[in-house]
Regions:
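Alpha/beta-hydrolase active-site loop
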Residues: 119-140
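Short beta-strand/loop motif that positions the catalytic acidic residue
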Residues: 256, 262-264
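Alpha/beta-hydrolase-fold enzymes
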Residues: 151-239
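N-terminal cap/lid segment of alpha/beta-hydrolase-fold proteins
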Residues: 18-19, 29-62
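Catalytic active-site module of serine/aspartate enzymes centered on a nucleophile-bearing elbow/loop
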Residues: 294-337
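Active-site glycine-rich loops that stabilize anionic/oxyanionic intermediates
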Residues: 77-80, 266
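Conserved alpha/beta-hydrolase
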Residues: 82-84, 89-114
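Conserved alpha/beta-hydrolase "acid-adjacent" motif
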Residues: 269-275
């Protein structure tokens, strides 16, 4: 049972801001390393500030040559550091996008002090941290009226529906983003998920003050206690966060009237099965929603899974498939790449 539980991390993830730049600017690796004909962007570390004053680590990736023709914000899966999306951000910058990645409070570069003392919640990640990232993107694009593409992975694509400023986006591309509700998961995985949310997570948080990384599998990041408790509460209720009365004032998914492309990964049955992605599609009721699916075979692999879409391999072979349809469906993005 425990071996099944510790592999469930990604399954059920599913403010205005100021920026202060650091002095660190790095140049991306060579194009040959990524198998892309396009040049790759350069990265600059920054800090965002959310409405409550919390500083968040972030990185801007700029096109290697010429001015940016569009802006993209990449919102991570729950607990996943922004560095995981670096290769994708570099590639996207090479296509002419200015790309923002960022860490939620309590995660990686946005962590301060011992994890058990981190006061953040999932509500904070969506309402404060995502909103801060969108405000940064708005400031970056406002003077040139650049188009804005939102990219979300897992939690980053479902919780964006609570962020302030989402209505100003030109398109949303979400990969393996879902409604993290156990009834939507197939077979025995549903019952494992029920135990995960009703006993495993609450018990560990009560004992340790946070959710340890080892409790979710090899390489997983620890989560603040407040985040884990809210995650478990949402997983125990029908409708996930979208049914939480406390989240209703922040619901903004219905404000999107632009193209929204929601991708499932065919072999991601444990983490974001098609039914869970379908349930998320219902939240964007006023958008031009399109449901799509990608399989490992389409990019020359035998396994892709929940996290494979943002790895360097398959990298551009897959990213082209994800980006081309949303650019084609969004007039302002057609000349971005």
């Amino acid at each position: 049972m425990v071996s099944s539980l510790v592999n469930l991390k990604a399954c059920f993830y599913s403010g205005r801001m100021n920026t202060t730049t650091t002095t660190t600017t790095t140049t991306a690796p060579s194009v040959a390393q990524h198998g892309s004909a396009a040049g790759l962007g350069t990265a600059e570390r920054q800090y965002l500030m959310a409405d409550d004053g919390r500083h968040l680590a972030a990185s801007w990736f700029e096109p290697p040559t010429g001015a940016a023709r569009a802006v993209a914000v990449v919102s991570s899966a729950a607990g996943v550091p922004r560095g995981y999306y670096r290769a994708f951000a570099e590639w996207l910058a090479g296509r002419g996008y200015a790309v923002l990645t960022y860490d939620y409070r309590g995660i990686a570069g946005s962590r301060r002090g011992p994890m058990r003392q981190e006061p953040g919640t999932m509500r904070d990640w969506a309402v404060l941290d995502m909103s801060a990232a969108l405000a940064a993107a708005e400031a970056r694009r406002a003077t040139q009226r650049l188009p804005l593409l939102l990219v979300g992975h897992s939690f980053g694509g479902n919780a964006i529906g609570f962020a302030s400023g989402v209505e100003r986006a030109d398109a949303l591309l979400a990969v393996a983003s879902q409604v993290g509700e156990p009834r939507l998961y197939p077979g025995v995985k549903r019952w494992v998920a029920e135990f995960f949310f009703r006993a495993w997570v609450p018990g560990l948080v009560a004992t340790t003050g946070h959710l340890p990384g080892w409790a979710m599998g090899p390489g997983a990041q620890a989560m603040p206690g407040g985040v884990a408790r809210q995650w478990a509460r949402w997983g125990r209720q029908r409708g996930w966060a979208f049914a939480d009365p406390a989240m209703q004032p922040y619901r903004s998914a219905s404000a999107l009237t632009v193209p929204v492309h929601l991708w499932d990964v065919s072999d991601d049955l444990t983490f974001a099965p098609a039914a869970a992605v379908d349930a998320l599609a219902e939240q964007f009721r006023n958008a031009a929603v399109k449901r799509l699916s990608i399989s490992p075979a389409q990019v020359g692999l035998t396994r892709l899974g929940h996290f494979g879409a943002f790895r360097r391999d398959p990298g551009p072979r897959l990213w082209e498939r994800l980006l081309a349809p949303i650019e084609a469906a969004t007039p302002r993005l057609r000349f971005a790449g």
